[in-house]
Design a protein with these regions (language model features):
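Glycine-rich dinucleotide-binding loop and its adjacent helix/turn
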Residues: 1-42
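N-terminal FAD-binding dinucleotide-binding subdomain shared by FAD-dependent oxidases/monooxygenases
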Residues: 1, 14-15, 28, 43-174
Length: 174
C-alpha cells in the first residue's frame, strides 16, 4: 500500500477521503471493528489484516435526554454506592443463578434480552458464571459466535472472524 496512512487513535478531525481507494486495516480490535463497517461502503477495496479473531458485541450507546440525565445526577450518591459494590464498578449486578441451572430456552431468552440492552448488561447482568472459564462461558461464547455469523453474510469469512482459541471475556470485547 502507498499513500496516506493513519492510526485510528490519531484520526484527523476532518476525516480522510477514502472514496474509491484501496484501503488496508491492520487488526480487528475495538477501533478497527468500529472503523471497518463505516469505511467499507465508500472504499474501492478493503483488506483487513487479522492475527486473532475477537468477540465483538454492540454497546448500543446513544444520547441521553435531559430528563434522564437529571435523574442520573439526582441519584449520584446511590449510583456511586452501587458501583462500589459491583464487578467492574458498573451499574450491573450478575444474575446469581448459574447459566447451566436453567433450561437452554431460558438461557437463550436471557442472552437475547441482554444483547439488546445498551452498555455492559450483556456481560455484567448475565448469569454469574458466564464470565468464568467453563461450560457456562462456552455456552455464551457460542451465542456470541452465532451473532457474528448472523452479521457476516459470507460463511467462509464469518468463520475467519469467529474466535476459537480463547474464552469469552478473556480479552477485552470490542
Amino acid at each position: 500500500f502507498e499513500g496516506p496512512w493513519c492510526h485510528t487513535g490519531r484520526w484527523p478531525k476532518k476525516g480522510m477521503d477514502l472514496a474509491g481507494k484501496r484501503v488496508g486495516v491492520i487488526g480487528t480490535g475495538a477501533s478497527a471493528v468500529q472503523l471497518i463497517p463505516m469505511i467499507a461502503p465508500e472504499v474501492a477495496h478493503l483488506t483487513v489484516f487479522q492475527r486473532t479473531a475477537n468477540y465483538c458485541a454492540p454497546l448500543r450507546n446513544g444520547p441521553i435526554d435531559e430528563e434522564t440525565m437529571n435523574e442520573i445526577k439526582e441519584n449520584y450518591p446511590e449510583i456511586f454506592r452501587a458501583c462500589n459494590e459491583t464487578a467492574g464498578s458498573f451499574m450491573h449486578e450478575f444474575d446469581p443463578r448459574s447459566a447451566m441451572d436453567v433450561s437452554p430456552e431460558e438461557r437463550l431468552e436471557q442472552y437475547e434480552r441482554l444483547w439488546q440492552k445498551s452498555g455492559f448488561a450483556k456481560w455484567l447482568s448475565n448469569f454469574r458464571d458466564v464470565m468464568l472459564p467453563g461450560e457456562a462461558n462456552e455456552d455464551y461464547a457460542e451465542f456470541v459466535r452465532g451473532k457474528i455469523r448472523e452479521r457476516v453474510h459470507d460463511p467462509v469469512v464469518a468463520e475467519m472472524l469467529v474466535p476459537k482459541d480463547h474464552t469469552f471475556g478473556a480479552k477485552r470485547v470490542p
